[in-house]
Amino acid sequence: YADFEGGAPNGSFRIILLDPFDYDDREFGTTRTFMTATFSQKQVDWLISTLRDAAAKGLHVITAMHYSFGDNSLPFTEELAKPDAVFYQDPFMIPDIIDAIQHKKVLKATYRDEKGKQNIRVNEDFRDVADLDYVCHLFGHIHSRNEYRCQKTDGSKKYDILMIGEASLSTMGTALNKIIRTQGTLNEIQFSALIIDTVEKNIYRVGYGAGTTYNLSDSGRLSKISYKF
């Protein structure tokens, strides 16, 4: 993770980088395949400690990983955002942890590894933790929505967790957010800049480069996203 000092009134930030490939390299291509995610007990314990520490220090927290969190079996729809990975442990394990800290709850659960022995056990009492200001989870390309609120597949739970990602890599497939690229020009790439207002809990996003149309105006590249739930 890395901490960044910010000025008043927005405060300072902690960005936590997660590793979804936290397993023995010898398992890749056999037990574990491409576009899947597996975490270790050590990483989960570290994440919990790092989140507790950030809350105690009054830092605004952002997590980041190539994948978003959610169920990869979902269809491509606006309502049900779909990550680009199959999670071999529960895809809502880390959202469960963040949620328990946010709402100061006890979390006692075992998240089983579908492909091996990396079962994750969490037995934590977060009732005494300091207030956690969780801003968002940043991820890479996705084939459905670029901004969405994390929720259980069956709609039984909505997390106070905002997911923000980039546009899909190409116009291939059935992606909702298809973008047009012109090879050898600035419109071959696409990226965003984020401005975070921690007072009003808004994120202002500015997109650059390739867009959904060749005539995408500057106003069409601007969006305001609330993380106040």
Q: Model segments located where?
A:
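Conserved beta-sheet core of the metallophosphoesterase superfamily
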Residues: 79-200
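Solvent-exposed loop/turn segments at secondary-structure junctions
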Residues: 20-24, 67-71, 141-146, 168-172, ...
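Active-site-proximal beta-strand elements of phosphoester/diester hydrolases
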Residues: 11-26, 64, 160-168, 205-208
